[in-house]
């Protein structure tokens, strides 16, 4: 570890088909590949799973916590490629009924909404997706030191296995959720050859912090914003802050604040921005100190929390909850932001990743954006051709009001910097 469903039984993981798909290849040190659908990431040891991925806090422990408390309607599992009995590739999976209307912007959004009302089964298919509803970066695990040819071969085998598994569990659409620009550089061609299309997902905001202290960071902001932040911090002077590794005894309050904050969001992404019951306690317990929570109290009462994951060179801000209208009266969002910036600088952590919402504020505060993609394909060839034709009109970023307003002012990181 790195620290610094309707129509189908909900417990899909216990009903995974036991098939194994074998793939023999040439010109590679890998002798023979078999791809197996597994009911959980725990079917592979923690060390064997983590060895396939770059060091990250969103590792086996994180995925296990997500499996134990999924959002409503989600079921989690995994797919692993083996060379003999040695795992050489792996992806986490989830299955969910997904509203296709969510991904279409003008001019198809009106038609999609109409079809959703008239043909709900057509517009709400059962999707089998690579990734996690709790992660903003799609984990594609390939064995360390794999050559380019081996990496392509392992991914192609995983894709073939996914097609078989999707058919076995009744999913008509396959998807890769939030593939980073960095992974798209090597995986795109293989995915396209396998019949996948893609459209933009929501980008991820990243703040680079190569500063010696908070004053240096503030000096990079516009003078008017600096004055505004100083005023907001003075208004929040009564707020008491604690950084903890446990929410024992307060998890009900944390869940309540999270639900309250969801009701104030400008865009609703359904269960994709929700968590399951007891998720926060599971996360804090499973991540052994990599998960921290900033607790803000006013007069002894919890008014805000911010769950974040600590890596060697990056902090991932994952979940925030605030009490309203206190949040606005005391500028708790900005207070949380500056306290997290202070934490990163104090710990010499150079990057603060803040997720897929509230882009306008994050850009003003110095963030840049990492592009990400959703790759998808239908199992039926004709339906897949129709989805391919609709792909240019699909884009989650077009549904976000902040991104529409930012337009060309949004600054994106180049693809080769999208991977930490």
Functional labels for PLM-detected ranges:
Residues 71-74, 113-118, 126-130, 210-214, ...:
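Low-complexity, flexible helical/coil segments
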Residues 74-77, 82-83, 94-200, 314-377:
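Acyl-donor binding region in acyl/amide transferases
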Residues 47, 84, 148-160, 164, ...:
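Polar/charged alpha-helical tracts
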Residues 25-111, 163, 173-329, 413-418:
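A conserved beta-strand-loop-helix scaffold within acyl/acetyltransferase catalytic domains
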Residues 2-7, 13-32, 95-96, 179-180, ...:
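Active-site/acyl-donor-binding loops of N-acyltransferases
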Residues 6-7, 15, 36, 51, ...:
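Compositionally biased, intrinsically disordered/low-complexity regions enriched for serine, proline
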């Amino acid at each position: 570890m790195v620290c610094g469903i309707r129509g189908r039984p909900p417990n899909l993981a216990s009903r995974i088909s036991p098939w194994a798909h074998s793939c023999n290849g040439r010109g590679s040190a890998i002798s023979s590949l078999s791809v197996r659908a597994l009911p959980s990431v725990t079917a592979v040891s923690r060390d064997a799973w983590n060895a396939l991925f770059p060091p990250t806090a969103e590792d086996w422990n994180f995925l296990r916590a997500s499996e134990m408390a999924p959002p409503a309607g989600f079921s989690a599992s995994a797919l692993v490629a083996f060379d003999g009995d040695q795992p050489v590739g792996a992806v986490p999976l989830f299955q969910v009924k997904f509203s296709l209307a969510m991904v279409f912007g003008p001019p198809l959004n009106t038609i999609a909404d109409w079809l959703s009302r008239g043909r709900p089964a057509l517009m709400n298919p059962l999707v089998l997706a690579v990734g996690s509803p709790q992660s903003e970066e799609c984990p594609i695990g390939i064995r360390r030191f794999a050559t380019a040819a081996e990496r392509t071969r392992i991914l192609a085998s995983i894709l073939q296995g996914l097609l078989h598994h999707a058919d076995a569990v009744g999913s008509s659409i396959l998807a890769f959720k939030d593939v980073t620009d960095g992974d798209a550089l090597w995986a795109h061609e293989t995915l396209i050859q396998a019949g996948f299309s893609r459209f933009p997902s929501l980008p991820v905001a990243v703040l680079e912090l190569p500063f010696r202290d908070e004053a240096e960071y503030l000096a990079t902001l516009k003078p008017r914003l600096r004055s505004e932040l100083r005023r907001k911090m003075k208004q929040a002077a009564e707020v008491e802050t604690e950084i903890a590794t446990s929410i024992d005894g307060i998890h009900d309050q944390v869940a309540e604040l999270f639900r309250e904050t969801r009701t104030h969001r400008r865009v609703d992404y359904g269960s994709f921005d929700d968590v399951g019951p007891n998720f926060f306690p599971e996360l804090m317990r499973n991540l052994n100190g990599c998960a921290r929570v900033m607790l803000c109290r006013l007069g002894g009462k919890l008014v805000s929390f911010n769950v974040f994951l600590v890596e060697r060179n990056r902090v991932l801000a994952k979940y925030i909850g605030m009490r309203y209208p206190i949040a606005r009266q005391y500028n708790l969002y900005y207070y949380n932001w500056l306290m997290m910036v202070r934490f990163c600088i104090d710990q010499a952590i150079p990057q603060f990743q803040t997720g897929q919402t509230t882009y306008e504020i994050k850009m003003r505060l110095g963030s840049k954006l990492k592009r990400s993609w959703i790759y998808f394909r239908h199992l039926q060839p004709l339906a897949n051709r129709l989805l391919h034709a609709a792909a240019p009109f699909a884009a989650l970023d077009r549904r976000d009001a902040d991104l529409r307003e930012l337009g060309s002012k949004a600054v994106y990181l180049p693809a080769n910097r999208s991977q930490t």
